[in-house]
């Protein structure tokens, strides 16, 4: 498993647990988290944890996340995924993530592109 797939696996743990420590472990101290590329990012680990928890999916809300790391260029990885939600029958979200990692494999920049089908 490469460093980007390992990061996504840790993201999935945090997504399911909503544990502040799991979330914080994903991001550098001064990370940027873009919930959409055109929105202002959440700035810094503490803000990311707070905003994540304010908007969290409850454990069990999403049923499955299938993904593939489709590109790598140094510290930048591109992840394509599909989220299937358990709460809405047939609710699927297509995801494209830009993940830039530091030397400790924490995200310094995370950008979500998504669309519901």
What are these model-predicted stretches?
Residues 1-29:
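Short, low-complexity N-terminal intrinsically disordered segments enriched in polar/charged residues
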Residues 21-73:
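A solvent-exposed, acidic/Ser-Thr-rich amphipathic alpha-helical stretch
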Residues 3, 50-117:
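A beta-strand edge to alpha-helix "cap/lid" segment located at domain peripheries
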Residues 11, 23-24, 31, 44, ...:
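Hydrophobic pocket/interface hotspot
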Residues 1, 12, 20, 36-39, ...:
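Short, charged low-complexity linear motifs
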């Amino acid at each position: 498993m490469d460093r980007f797939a390992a990061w996504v696996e840790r993201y999935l743990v945090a997504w399911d647990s909503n544990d502040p420590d799991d979330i914080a472990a994903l991001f550098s101290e001064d990370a940027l988290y873009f919930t959409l590329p055109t929105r202002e990012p959440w700035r810094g680990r503490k803000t990311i944890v707070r905003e994540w928890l304010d908007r969290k999916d409850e454990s069990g809300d999403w049923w499955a996340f299938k993904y593939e790391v489709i590109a790598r260029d140094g510290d930048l990885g591109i992840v394509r995924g599909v989220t299937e939600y358990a709460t809405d029958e047939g609710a699927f979200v297509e995801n494209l993530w830009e993940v830039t990692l530091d030397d400790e494999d924490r995200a310094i920049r995370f950008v979500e592109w998504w669309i519901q089908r």
